[in-house]
């Protein structure tokens, strides 16, 4: 029998069928364990091992978790990583099914613990360093931590340093091969010590006297994609005399062109590369695309040689006087620019075929390799990437005559992949945090591309569980550094509404409604006697408009903002639809009463009759597209989107501009704003940016939303009600005369092929079984039925 291991996702508590009294309910037969000399005073890497001998071929299911993160090895082969990111009240464990042959085996977990300090990941919650493994069935006594004789050893060679500019992402790894415990993955070496039990293990079934440690729950997501990539090309090879290269501009006169073929061979997985003794080399590698990946290098000889691998999204242009933020210019260009990045360093021990890699992945398009050798040449046997992100399988696709929309697909899908891991992320290079405002747009794009909604569910659930005493969600979660952006709580209500439309899970939506009401109540408390919402305490961010203060429009911080008032009204109306749709008409009536009262007050206070638009502030000194968008989304139709001198929506908020444009028949505005994304292609971007140039981040998935709008706005495919049990197709093709598309649906897939000739639509629409709908073209409608439908509507 050959050993096999498989990660599985389970839905239920694995030990929930054990009959226990209320004081012990949820207890596991395993305990959390710890190295006897590692208490959490500083970063540590600890290996845990359990050596066993099986008398017969065996299958067993095990559940594994750690604080902070683990890698799990079976007989020296890595079988998984974890624990999936969550918080202490919902600490995830992974489940593995093992098929083992008779004979000796060794399980080893390598557990990293950085701690809650300035170099730690903001998104990584921690209690204290610990490891847990629980087996089901008869092998529990043989394998469970706290019961079986597990051993541990602290691994040498690791140093964790600041991520520098990539703040909030996690410490970077310095690994000294001479001090490293090679072979520990196989259980080899000495200095193993008996572990100590530090806490009983409990699940969320615990009902009384709950723990102050980790409340266990099953992992919600599958294993992340990890696939090897041999990619990239050496754009610049340089002889250097210092390892401090941050201000060393790339100059073609310094380029060692004759060394490029050898580096390119290494990068493609072809041959090894030897760096001579007493040499310093700097190589800038263009990966050709944006990657999130573990860099993996195998080294031989070259005792005490150093290999530093840093990552950057782009190189930087020279500093400009009086401007603290450096520009990047065309992302394809490197000449005259500086490489300012972050990454990991490996110091080789001189032995053969040593494999080095960091404990967390890196991100970017460009890699700077700096190699420094001593008295012995260094052989780089292999250099590759282990690409890492959520394992999407995209089935949504479209074809349109617009080159801009065609070019958008690789950029938008790539940025979504790069910002999707164990949570969604705002950006993989900097904070790696799941922000509500970003996530709503990422999730909508996900709905259009795949029927896999596990990551959207996790996001909605974790935000719900992040709510504090005020009732508002955290702006970003999980995060050990709390942050409150009140408008983001309103977007979370929008996420629940979106899920209710695009997916079909009544129980999940109903479970979120108490949280929806809590958010609305927190805002309602700030509505004054006139009916206007006064600023809610927190960072009232709306958009990265360049002349706004920290993304806040006029009076958003301490006064009364027209934009945020309309945003609240828009959210109240979505909440009322949810309440009606899920059986609570009384709550729906309450939400509508408040929305109507506020809309009347906001119209009086902010409508500017001379300009024919809503003001951002009570003094009518500031005007924006943002106020008009939220007014339209809240039901107002007297305003307009094309008034002169409005503060313009950036790449993020343009989603709401496109939503509003759809409602008022101004689809021309969507096509006009596509130049934001065309600019990205012209300037060498592989992913969408965070904000107007000079942008901090080159990879922000809130900029993927035009992909969603191609399906939902231009091709016009939208749910006609909750559960997507019927569909409303109302295409607004703008200057395009045809379009084809397929999107996933809870009951299968939905596809269409449309052609417009002199205002008349023809084509085919195919709906899943059990799904009906309506096709609209102006005032004309055609009923749609399950299966194939042939169109024939005339119109404008």
Feature locations, PLM:
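Non-catalytic C-terminal accessory modules of carbohydrate-active enzymes
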Residues: 166-167, 174-179, 593, 668-796
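Active-site acid/base region of carbohydrate-active enzymes
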Residues: 130, 142-147, 151, 366, ...
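Alpha-helical support elements that line or immediately flank enzyme active sites
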Residues: 96, 294-313, 367-372, 436-466, ...
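Extracellular/oxidizing-compartment recognition motifs
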Residues: 1-426, 438, 454-455, 474-478, ...
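Non-transmembrane amphipathic alpha-helical segments
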Residues: 496, 569-572, 576-579
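Acidic/polar loop patches that form or flank catalytic/metal-binding clefts of enzymes
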Residues: 108-109, 117-120, 140-144, 455-456, ...
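Solvent-exposed loop and edge beta-strand segments that line ligand/cofactor-binding
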Residues: 284-287, 357-358, 423-436, 477-489, ...
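Acidic, mature catalytic/reactive cores of soluble proteins
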Residues: 301-320, 324, 353-357, 375-378, ...
């Amino acid at each position: 029998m050959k050993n096999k291991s498989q990660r599985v996702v389970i839905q239920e508590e694995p030990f929930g069928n054990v009959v226990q009294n209320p004081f012990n309910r949820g207890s596991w037969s395993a305990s959390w364990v710890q190295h006897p000399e590692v208490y959490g005073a500083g970063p540590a890497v600890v290996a845990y091992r359990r050596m066993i001998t099986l008398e017969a071929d065996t299958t067993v299911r095990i559940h594994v978790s750690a604080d902070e993160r683990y890698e799990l090895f079976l007989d020296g082969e890595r079988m998984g990583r974890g624990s999936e990111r969550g918080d202490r009240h919902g600490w995830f464990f992974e489940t593995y099914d093992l098929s083992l042959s008779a004979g000796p085996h060794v399980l080893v977990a390598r557990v990293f613990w950085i701690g809650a300090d300035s170099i730690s990941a903001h998104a990584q919650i921690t209690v204290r360093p610990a490891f847990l493994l629980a087996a089901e069935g008869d092998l529990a006594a043989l394998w469970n931590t706290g019961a079986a004789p597990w051993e541990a050893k602290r691994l040498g060679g690791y140093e964790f340093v600041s991520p520098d500019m990539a703040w909030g992402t996690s410490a970077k790894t310095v690994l000294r091969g001479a001090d490293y415990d090679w072979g520990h993955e196989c259980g080899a070496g000495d200095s193993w010590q008996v572990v100590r039990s530090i806490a009983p293990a409990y699940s969320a079934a615990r009902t009384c006297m709950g723990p102050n440690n980790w409340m266990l729950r099953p992992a919600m997501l599958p294993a992340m994609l990890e696939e090897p990539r041999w990619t990239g090309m050496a754009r610049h090879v340089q002889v250097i005399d210092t390892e401090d290269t941050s201000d060393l501009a790339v100059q073609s006169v310094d380029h060692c062109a004759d060394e490029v073929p050898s580096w390119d061979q290494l990068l493609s997985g072809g041959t090894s590369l030897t760096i001579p003794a007493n040499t310093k080399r700097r190589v800038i590698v263009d990966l050709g695309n944006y990657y999130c990946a573990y860099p993996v290098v195998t080294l031989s000889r070259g005792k005490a040689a150093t290999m530093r691998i840093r990552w950057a999204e782009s190189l930087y242009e020279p500093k400009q006087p009086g401007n603290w933020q450096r520009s990047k210019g065309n992302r394809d260009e490197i000449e005259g620019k500086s490489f300012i990045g972050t990454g990991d360093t490996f110091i080789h021990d001189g032995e053969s075929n040593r494999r080095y890699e960091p404990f967390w992945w890196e991100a970017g398009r460009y890699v700077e390799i700096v190699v420094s050798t001593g008295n012995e040449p260094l052989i780089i046997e292999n250099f590759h990437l282990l690409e890492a992100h959520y394992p999407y399988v995209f089935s949504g696709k479209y074809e349109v005559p617009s080159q801009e929309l065609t070019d958008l697909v690789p950029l938008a899908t790539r940025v979504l992949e790069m910002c999707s891991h164990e949570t969604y992320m705002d950006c993989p290079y900097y904070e790696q945090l799941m922000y509500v405002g970003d996530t709503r747009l990422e999730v909508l794009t996900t709905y259009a591309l795949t029927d896999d909604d596990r990551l959207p569910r996790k996001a909605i659930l974790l935000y719900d569980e992040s709510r504090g005493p005020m009732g508002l969600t955290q702006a970003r979660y999980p995060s050990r550094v709390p942050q409150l952006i009140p408008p983001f709580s309103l977007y979370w209500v929008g996420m629940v509404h979106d899920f209710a439309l695009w997916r079909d899970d009544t129980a999940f939506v109903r479970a979120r409604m108490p949280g929806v009401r809590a958010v609305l109540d927190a805002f309602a408390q700030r509505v004054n006697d006139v009916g206007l919402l006064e600023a809610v305490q927190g960072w009232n961010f709306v958009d990265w408009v360049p002349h706004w203060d920290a993304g806040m429009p006029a009076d958003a911080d301490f006064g009364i903002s027209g934009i945020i008032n309309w945003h609240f009204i828009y959210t109240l109306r979505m909440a009322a639809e949810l309440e009606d749709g899920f059986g609570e008409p009384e709550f729906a009536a309450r939400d509508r009463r408040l929305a109507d009262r506020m809309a009347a007050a906001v119209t009086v206070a902010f409508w500017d009759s001379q300009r024919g638009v809503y003001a951002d502030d009570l003094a009518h000194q500031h005007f924006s597209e943002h106020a008009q968008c939220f007014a339209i989304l809240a039901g107002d139709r007297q305003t307009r989107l094309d008034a002169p001198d409005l503060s313009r929506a950036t790449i993020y908020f343009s989603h709401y501009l496109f939503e509003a444009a759809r409602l008022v028949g101004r689809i021309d505005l969507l096509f006009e704003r596509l130049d934001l994304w065309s600019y990205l292609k012209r300037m060498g971007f592989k992913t969408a940016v965070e904000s107007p140039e000079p942008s901090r981040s080159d990879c922000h998935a809130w900029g993927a939303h035009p992909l969603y709008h191609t399906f939902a706005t231009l091709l016009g495919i939208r749910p006609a009600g909750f559960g997507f049990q019927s569909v409303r197709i109302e295409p607004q093709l703008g200057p395009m005369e045809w379009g084809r598309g397929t999107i996933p649906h809870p009951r299968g897939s939905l596809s269409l092929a449309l052609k417009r000739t002199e205002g008349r639509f023809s084509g085919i629409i195919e709906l899943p079984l059990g799904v009906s709908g309506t096709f609209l073209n102006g005032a004309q409608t055609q009923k749609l039925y399950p299966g194939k439908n042939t169109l024939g509507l005339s119109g404008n």
